């Protein structure tokens, strides 16, 4: 689950980290009033969406008057912001963050992520702030410095000092960086984060460290024990199909292709997408119905896949282990009848009751294409999609 920048900064402030005074506003009038609360004569106004690249898309502005703030809010609130990280529709802007302006002398990067390889929370720091860390990792990996947290003792001051020295910080800045590092480390563990970024972490004109931006992703599997963070969820930022799928315990991710995929098991789903690509097709989604798939969930899965107007054909790939292929076949038949499927459906069944499932599909009288293997299924669905 992602948080907005203003929500991330609220958490930073709770842990004693230096952030700009700011207010998240839902109306142009609120935005103008926020400037009065903050004071000064220059403010930064930012669209709040779950995507990067806001500045280049016009979603961040330096405002020198309340009229500029009001105009910015009127222009963006209720509209969608399209960035390089969103799809063509963009993300809806429901709040504008108005905050005080900071004079920047230098930009740094500080982030943390759960590293599955080392099974540790790993902090990353770099002197190359303000740019994508992926770009830095690709072009100049030697400029990224790391510190892995011991799961028994958590963040340690010596780790912060080592990173501070590598970033070229001096004097009071080292103390400030240590406080930020320790706070972020504790926050990461307390709040079950999966990813945390401050990009940029800036050195101000006065020589102090300041958290200018904030990006947080929370481990969705831990939300049951984070009631406060659950309340921060903004459903307006979710793909409606993904939200619908979550209600039925389906793992669905929308993609840009034209071949709908319904598979049981995440690994098999990824393999199915790969083989569709291998044979010249383009998956429209990732959809894992899980090991405990029911007839009702299969029906809902079909509805979700077909709600995407780009879908020209559907591939159902089921390996029956826990789940029975005949039950999946009943779900497919029921879904095709209920939804009124107008696109070709290719089905590959293997494993538990696969023969019985295949017979049920054959006896249904519906226009369902049976595949003999995964390769055959991929070839058939690509051919069917091209024919549409």
Curated annotation (Swiss-Prot):
Q: Which reaction does it catalyse?
A: succinate + ATP + CoA = succinyl-CoA + ADP + phosphate; GTP + succinate + CoA = succinyl-CoA + GDP + phosphate
The record lists substrate as bound by 264, 321-323
EC no.?
A: 6.2.1.5
Name the residues that bind ATP. 46, 53-55, 99, 102, 107
Task: Give all residue intervals belonging to the ATP-grasp domain.
Answer: 9-244
**What residues does Mg(2+) bind to?**
199, 213
Q: Keywords in UniProt for this one? A: ATP-binding, Ligase, Magnesium, Metal-binding, Nucleotide-binding, Tricarboxylic acid cycle
Q: Name one GO molecular function term.
A: succinate-CoA ligase (ADP-forming) activity
What pathway or pathways are given for this protein in its record?
Answer: Carbohydrate metabolism; tricarboxylic acid cycle; succinate from succinyl-CoA (ligase route): step 1/1
Q: Which cofactor does it need?
A: Mg(2+)
Single GO biological process annotation from the record: tricarboxylic acid cycle
**What InterPro entries does the record point to?**
ATP-grasp, ATP-grasp_succ-CoA_synth-type, ATP_grasp_subdomain_1, Succ-CoA_synthase_bsu_CS, SUCC_ACL_C, Succ_CoA_ligase-like_bsu, Succinyl-CoA_synth-like
The record's GO CC annotations read: cytosol; succinate-CoA ligase complex
**Cofactor note, please?**
Binds 1 Mg(2+) ion per subunit.
**PANTHER family for this protein:** SUCCINATE--COA LIGASE [GDP-FORMING] SUBUNIT BETA, MITOCHONDRIAL, SUCCINYL-COA SYNTHETASE BETA CHAIN
- HAMAP family assigned: Succ_CoA_beta
- Complex and partners: Heterotetramer of two alpha and two beta subunits.
Summarizing the function annotation, the protein's role is: Succinyl-CoA synthetase functions in the citric acid cycle (TCA), coupling the hydrolysis of succinyl-CoA to the synthesis of either ATP or GTP and thus represents the only step of substrate-level phosphorylation in the TCA. The beta subunit provides nucleotide specificity of the enzyme and binds the substrate succinate, while the binding sites for coenzyme A and phosphate are found in the alpha subunit.
UniProt record similarity statement: Belongs to the succinate/malate CoA ligase beta subunit family.
Protein name per UniProt: Succinate--CoA ligase [ADP-forming] subunit beta
Record lineage: Bacteria, Pseudomonadati, Pseudomonadota, Gammaproteobacteria, Aeromonadales
What gene is it encoded by? sucC
């Amino acid at each position: 689950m992602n948080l907005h920048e203003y929500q991330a900064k609220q958490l930073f402030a709770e842990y004693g980290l230096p952030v700009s005074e700011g207010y998240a506003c839902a109306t142009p009038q609120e935005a103008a009033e926020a400037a009065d609360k903050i004071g000064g004569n220059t403010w930064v106004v930012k669209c709040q969406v779950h995507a990067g690249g806001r500045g280049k898309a016009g979603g961040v502005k330096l405002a020198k008057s309340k009229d500029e703030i009001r105009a910015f809010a009127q222009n963006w609130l209720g509209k969608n912001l399209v960035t390089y990280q969103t799809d063509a529709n963009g993300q809806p802007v429901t709040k504008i963050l108005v905050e005080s302006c900071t004079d920047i002398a230098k930009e740094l990067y500080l982030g943390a992520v759960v590293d599955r390889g080392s099974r540790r929370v790993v902090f990353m720091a770099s002197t190359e702030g303000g740019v994508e860390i992926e770009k830095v990792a690709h072009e100049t990996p030697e400029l990224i410095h790391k510190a892995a947290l011991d799961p028994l003792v958590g963040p340690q001051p010596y780790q912060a000092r080592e990173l501070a020295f590598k970033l070229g910080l001096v004097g009071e800045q080292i103390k400030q960086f240590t406080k930020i590092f320790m706070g972020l480390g504790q926050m990461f563990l307390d709040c079950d984060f999966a990813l945390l970024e401050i990009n940029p972490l800036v050195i101000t004109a006065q020589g102090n460290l300041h958290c200018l931006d904030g990006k947080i992703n929370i481990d969705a599997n831990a939300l049951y024990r984070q009631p406060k963070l659950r309340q921060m969820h903004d459903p307006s930022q979710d793909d409606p199909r993904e939200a619908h799928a979550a209600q039925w315990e389906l793992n669905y991710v929308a993609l840009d292709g034209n071949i709908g995929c319904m598979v049981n098991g995440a690994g098999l789903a990824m393999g199915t997408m790969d083989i569709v690509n291998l044979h010249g097709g383009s998956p429209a989604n990732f959809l894992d119905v899980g090991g405990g798939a029911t007839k009702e969930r299969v029906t809902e899965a079909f509805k979700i896949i077909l709600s995407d107007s780009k879908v020209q054909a559907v591939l159902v790939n089921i390996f029956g282990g826990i789940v029975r292929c005949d039950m999946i076949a009943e779900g497919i038949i029921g879904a095709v009848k209920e939804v009124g499927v107008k696109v070709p459906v290719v089905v590959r069944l293997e494993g538990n009751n696969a023969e019985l499932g295949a017979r049920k599909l054959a006896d249904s009288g519906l226009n369902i294409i049976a595949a003999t293997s995964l390769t055959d299924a991929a070839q058939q669905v690509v051919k069917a999609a091209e024919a549409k």
